[in-house]
Amino acid sequence: MRYLLFIALLTTCSILQAQSLRPKSIYASYFGETVTHPGLKIGVTYQLKFWDKTKTRKNGDKRIIQRSIELSPGIGYQTGLFVLPEWSYSRKNAKGNFLTAGIGAGYMRTFIPNVYDLNANGEIESIDAGYNYFLTNYSITFGKDLSVKKMIPISIYIKPQLMYALPNATNGISYFALELGASYKLTKN
């Protein structure tokens, strides 16, 4: 546990110390594999590239499309802790609705509660048990940016994702997870 927290601290500190990258937003969300495995996910979003395009339709309405490529390192808790940076591509329309596709790779440490073993003296003692995994995820995010119409610097989103953990079983194991959250914007884009 100490090592995982130390690695998470080093990763976060190295990203935050980068002079060219400023955090775009911070987020917190419900994160769960199913209703029976609820968890919490928190993180920061960094925008690596941004561009927008305005199109005028035949009826005279303007359509603004904003695109960005983002990096979102996050720390989450489900049946363990994970550090999972994500690369994502996002499109947002003039009404504030957005669609984001993302992929990520990181580390997950699971914990198994109430595990006991015999020590050298033959006494029963509680031990820390769990596994280390390489974790990948693939996600699509559907959301609404409330700052477009209501001037509130918050976005709300739903993010279904497929996660794949190695080593587990013979060929790894897949998880379907759902994330429901809110993001507070620190910048104007």
Model regions: which residues?
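Histidine- and/or cysteine-centered catalytic micro-motif in compact active-site loops
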Residues: Y3, S72, G104-G106
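Sec-dependent N-terminal signal peptides
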Residues: Y3-T12
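Generic marker of residues within folded, mature protein domains
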Residues: A8, A18, G32-T34, N59, ...
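A generic structural signal for short, non-catalytic loop/turn and secondary-structure boundary residues
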Residues: T11, Q19-L21, M151
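Short glycine/proline- and aromatic-enriched beta-strand/turn motifs that initiate or cap beta-hairpins
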Residues: A18-G80, K185-N189
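Generic structural signal for short, flexible, solvent-exposed coil/loop and linker residues
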Residues: L4-L5, S29, G60, I127, ...
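Outer-membrane beta-barrel transmembrane domain signature
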Residues: G80-N189
